[in-house]
Amino acid sequence: MKKLILISALFFSSNGLTVDEDLMQKNNDEIRPQKFKITTTWITMSDGVRLAADLYWPKDVIDDKKFPILLEYLPYRKDESRARNYALYSYFLENGYIVARVDIRGTGNSEGITVPHEYSDIELDDGEEVIEWLSKQDWSTGKIGMFGISWGGFNSIQMAMRNPPALKAFISVMATDYLYQEDVHYMDGIMVAGDSWMMRHDLDNSIPGAPEFKMDDEWIEKRFDVKPSVFTYMRQQRDGAFWDRASAKGQYHKIKIPGYHIGGWYDGYRNSLLRMLENVEAPVKAMIGPWDHYFPHNAWPEPQVEWRYEAVRWFDHWLKEINTGILEEPKFAVFVRNYHPPDSSLKEIDGFWRWEDDWPIKRIENHIWHAHSDHSLAKNPGTEDRHHLEYRASSGVEGGGPTMWWGSIPPDQKPMDELSLVYDSEVLDTPFEILGRPVARLRVSATAKRANWVVRISDIAPDGQVTQVAAAAFNGTHRNSARNPDDIIPGEEFNLNIDLHFTSWVFQKGHRIRVAVNNAIWPMLWPTPFPMETKILIGGDHGLKVEFP
């Protein structure tokens, strides 16, 4: 299995900063787990509730030696995930860090009533107390770093918004700063069908802590007899204060702590990297590779990256005051994707790494492609026309609808395209590279009061296979505001500007570009319940067009 280490030896090219490929191939097999000590402890909160913690210790612990501490703070039952934790943390232990793994209140072995939902005030209040406690122990240097993937990436960002004095740096992996539009509940402002992840999480939280799994009256009261958080989310169907509270979006000025953000092209949380790079004034770095929802060192698809090498350099700079040179290097490592077939069993994605000094990249230019009445896609607008589409609420299954969040590798898009309005370019005579968030501009109408629109960009290979490159959905009732949605007036035309999700792709010579539009992506997102027909303006100044960055 290929494992790559990011190296600081870079050289410039006309397309940005590129790494020496020979150095990128350094194998990390010499880093092997060793025997490290694990101890358990309680961390008492100000209200008397105790949180359960595991401490993973470096080998060279002596009585008077102090270490910086890395915190992973999760609701995922630490006692039953020690195999995962030991393998993950060993790299940090070998490099002179203690790692603390703490169960959130009311989860795993921690005491208290289960937190009411993700990233609640009580979770984050407790997090501040945990950081303070870790910083004051005799074996602590007083400098804490925080890291995590998914939930642990989210609350790392949120703790950075609170700026506890001992927290010196964080790393957020596969997480987002925009809870309403990009978490697993209302992707693109539309309810995720079933929210199955949240229901499974509620069930996990109801289980007593290991190893006793004690089922008594206290367990009934504090774990089992608690309202499932999925009901809380079902009542928060519009953007607003509930989501703002723990979203960095719109509150970037609160983050004073240096952050390193890692995303994946096949993960649903990748948009946040761009916003953090562009808006946070504290030091920021970012990396995005060809990965689904995994840490990059054991990710699928490959190539994998030993991200912990970068993490140690990052934390060494901020927690040990070692000049690792990491701040003198480019801010943004990007894996540029070449074509691959629409095969969900692919083990490796073809492409290459590029290092960029900043975001947005100044040399990027937008290229506008217009839909034409003959269903072609061209660089010039055509004559005005209107195309009609009969609504099918079940549409989406054919194109990989079960993928929860515009992640993973969807199957061939041809079956879904047959139920959509599609617009194809001529065969490309030169490669065409995009990097960023394409924007689809539409003028539409519907015969019902509620409708969604889905826009997909795909690559048509010479053999006819259609690979999805970028996509997004839009809730038509949010055309003016996601905070104050209003029904569509049947038959009335209005404009939509849809930001597709962050993507990178090189359309190869001999391939074609496809833009497809329809009104559902089931069973990823809940469809609207009304039979209808939708129309889209083609051609002229306001017809369907897509801006490719």
Model segments located where?
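N-terminal signal peptide c-region/cleavage motif recognized by signal peptidases
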Residues: 13-14
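N-terminal cap/lid segment of alpha/beta-hydrolase-fold proteins
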Residues: 25-65, 424, 428-430
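Cap/lid segment of the alpha/beta-hydrolase catalytic domain
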Residues: 61-136, 455, 461-463, 522
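Accessory cap/linker subdomain of secreted extracellular hydrolases
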Residues: 86, 94, 161-254
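Serine-hydrolase catalytic core
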Residues: 230-288
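C-terminal, loop-rich substrate-recognition/catalytic regions characterized by aromatic stacking residues
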Residues: 287, 296-297, 301-549
